Every structure is written in structure tokens, then in C-alpha cells.
Amino acid sequence: MTRNDLLDRLATTQASALETQGLGLVPMVVEQSGRGERAYDIYSRLLKERVVFMVGEVNDQTANLVVAQLLFLESENPDKDVSLYINSPGGSVSAGLAIYDTMQFIKPDVQTLCMGMAASMGAFLLAAGAKGKRSALPNSRIMIHQPLGGARGQASDIEIQAREILYLRERLNSILSEVTGQPVEKIARDTDRDNFMSGDQAVDYGLIDKVITRRS
């Protein structure tokens, strides 16, 4: 399988996932090459430029696709940055942590950019980008809060789930403290309820490094 075939398969799978989420049909682009015309879906074309999209809910399917693309781009060039564009309301903590761990694991720096909304795990992953390379567009909204969960069943089962949620809250707060420079105690207070921020407020908080109005 050639490089272009791998790119097509990865991005076409992502395109299908986005359509499944009700985000509409994915546009196609046509390029001229020495062998004639070639049609790409738009995500395949952008993946060739090392751009990965995380759009919609963070779930296992999203995580598998993002992780696969990050690993592939690392194998292509371990010294060239990857750009992760985020427009997400958040979702599964375990799926988000799979993406986070992969971002830290691979050699290339991962630049993150919020366009629209980065909430919950979306904001967490936005802040987890390489220091100095985390940004947002001017009208983006960023929201942090503590993990949500519910439990049912016997009292012992509910106790187990409660302990797990408390562990995840402490772990997420610890990571947010590392990437923002804020004390863990402040993170815990600020994530007790939904905490919305503008791009400039997110810069002051340390979640991102800059607000971008135009491509440089």
C-alpha cells in the first residue's frame, strides 16, 4: 500500500465518521499530477499537510482515528509538527486521555488550534498541545469543568464508580495544573462548575498561548 493510499484510508475513515455524526457530506478536491487527475476528500488532502481534525464528540471512534493519524504522521516525519484543529463539546474521559497520551508519546510537536468550541475534554486536549503552539481563533469559546458521571446498582458498585470519578478528577486537575501553570487548588475551584472563557481569558489562564486573527 502506497503512502497516498494510507492517507486516503485514514482520512476517508474520518470523513465517514463525521458523516455518521450528522456533520454532512464531505467535499472532494481534484488535483493534477503527472499521472493525471486525482480526487481526494478534503480531509485526505489536509492530512497530507499534517492537519488532523477533532470535530464533534470525543468518543472511542474519534480517539482511534486521531491516534492513528498522529502515529502515521510521526512515522512519515518525526521532526515536523502536526496541527490538531479542535471544534468539540468534549465527551469520554478515557477516549480523551488516549489522545492526550499519544500527543505526549509521539516525537513531533502537536500544535493545537480551537475553532468554534473546545469544551471539557476538547479544552483539555487544546491545552495539552506543545507549549508556545496552542492557539484559538478570535470568537472561539473554551470551557473547563470537572468530569461528569453517574452510577447505578448496588451500594458497593456506586462506591467504586464514585472513587473512579474522584481519581479522574484529581488526575485531570493535575495535568491541567502542569500545562497551565495554575495551582492544583485553583484548578479544582475553577472546574467545580462549567467555566467558560474567551480566547484572551484562556491565554491569561494558561490554557493557550495566543489568539490568532490571521494566518502568519
Swiss-Prot record:
It is found in: Cytoplasm. It holds the Pfam family CLP_protease. Signal peptide: none annotated. The keyword Protease applies. The active site is at 120 (nucleophile), 145. Its main location: cytoplasm. It catalyses: Hydrolysis of proteins to small peptides in the presence of ATP and magnesium. alpha-casein is the usual test substrate. In the absence of ATP, only oligopeptides shorter than five residues are hydrolyzed (such as succinyl-Leu-Tyr-|-NHMec, and Leu-Tyr-Leu-|-Tyr-Trp, in which cleavage of the -Tyr-|-Leu- and -Tyr-|-Trp bonds also occurs). GO terms for molecular function: ATP-dependent peptidase activity; ATPase binding; serine-type endopeptidase activity. InterPro entries: ClpP, ClpP/crotonase-like_dom_sf, ClpP/TepA, ClpP_His_AS, ClpP_Ser_AS. GO terms for biological process: protein quality control for misfolded or incompletely synthesized proteins. Cleaves peptides in various proteins in a process that requires ATP hydrolysis. Has a chymotrypsin-like activity. Plays a major role in the degradation of misfolded proteins. Fourteen ClpP subunits assemble into 2 heptameric rings which stack back to back to give a disk-like structure with a central cavity, resembling the structure of eukaryotic proteasomes. This is ATP-dependent Clp protease proteolytic subunit. It comes from Cupriavidus metallidurans (strain ATCC 43123 / DSM 2839 / NBRC 102507 / CH34) (Ralstonia metallidurans). The gene is clpP.
